[in-house]
Amino acid sequence: MPKILDGKKLAQEIELILQQAIESGLEVAKRRPGLAVLRVGDDPASGVYVNYKEKACDRIGVRSFAKHLKEDISLEELTETIKSLNEEKNVDGILLQLPLPSHLDEAALLRSIDPDKDADGLHPLNLGRLIKGEKGPRSCTPAGVMSLLERNQIKIEGKRAVVVGRSILVGKPMALMLEAANATVTIAHSRTKDLPSLTKEADLLVVAAGKPYLIGKNHVSENCVVIDVGIHRLPPDEENIKELKKTKLCGDVKIFEIEDKVAAYSPVPGGVGPMTVTMLLANTVDRWQKHCGLPLTISHLLP
């Protein structure tokens, strides 16, 4: 039987560590950590994600400064909002919920966030720190994957890792983190020819392609470890419900095809998703400790 990498359980364990770090630092800090999440427009998925992050903040004692901004906000207005949060002493982390409406310059807005308050690890300076192996905020989903692997004692060093997907949000930082852990890393993407021949060479396969059911039994080797970053809601037809064991959510991987073949896998839901939010909290608490002159007791949680 394969090992199921339970992100929900691990996220709860890490949240307890973060909560204890906050409570032990309050006497010196005189305030709780603060996280500002900016949501632009009425995208339903973004609304769900922001709500989930607010609940996570409540669980561990982080102040939430959520802002729901109008769909047609100008680049200048949103930049000014970010700048005001950069200067707000009670805010330790800022997250710009993606995707943004098409008229906004995502790269310019991410650059406008103070790198020291970059809760999502996407500022160019923090990506540069990742490349150089320096400490700093880390991209949340790849950081969650690394924690999931390490806490389950899955060896990375010396392994052949294949990352399917090359987004700045997941694929590229994921490859960098695996390389820093001494894996030999290959990145595959939509233009990769003969994807199965490449993925079957992997000891560790991380799939972040954003395509439902992209990976099946013909893509994986015996006893590999599969991390499924994707999450999708499928039409509720009978075939999908049967395959998904009566849930309407699926990932990029056909788990029902590979679960008897692999050594370990992350489920969808309950795998990478909870860890992504927990790493957002870890980035915020780490920044809070730094801003308040506290010992950096939780930085080991970030790769």
Swiss-Prot record:
CDD domains in the record: NAD_bind_m-THF_DH_Cyclohyd
Hydrolase found in the keyword field: yes
Pathway of action: One-carbon metabolism; tetrahydrofolate interconversion
The UniProt record lists the keyword Transmembrane helix: no
GO molecular function: methenyltetrahydrofolate cyclohydrolase activity; methylenetetrahydrofolate dehydrogenase (NADP+) activity
GO terms of biological process kind: L-histidine biosynthetic process; methionine biosynthetic process; purine nucleotide biosynthetic process; tetrahydrofolate interconversion
Catalytic activity of the protein: (6R)-5,10-methylene-5,6,7,8-tetrahydrofolate + NADP(+) = (6R)-5,10-methenyltetrahydrofolate + NADPH; (6R)-5,10-methenyltetrahydrofolate + H2O = (6R)-10-formyltetrahydrofolate + H(+)
InterPro entries: Aminoacid_DH-like_N_sf, NAD(P)-bd_dom_sf, THF_DH/CycHdrlase, THF_DH/CycHdrlase_cat_dom, THF_DH/CycHdrlase_CS, THF_DH/CycHdrlase_NAD-bd_dom
Binding site for NADP(+): G165, R166, S167, S190, I231
Cited SUPFAM superfamilies: Aminoacid dehydrogenase-like, N-terminal domain, NAD(P)-binding Rossmann-fold domains
GO CC terms in record: cytosol
Pfam families hit by this protein: THF_DHG_CYH (PF00763), THF_DHG_CYH_C (PF02882)
Subunit structure, interactors included: Homodimer.
Similarity comment: family membership: Belongs to the tetrahydrofolate dehydrogenase/cyclohydrolase family.
Role noted for this protein: Catalyzes the oxidation of 5,10-methylenetetrahydrofolate to 5,10-methenyltetrahydrofolate and then the hydrolysis of 5,10-methenyltetrahydrofolate to 10-formyltetrahydrofolate.
Record's protein name: Bifunctional protein FolD
Originating species: Prochlorococcus marinus (strain NATL1A)
Organism lineage: Bacteria, Bacillati, Cyanobacteriota, Cyanophyceae, Synechococcales
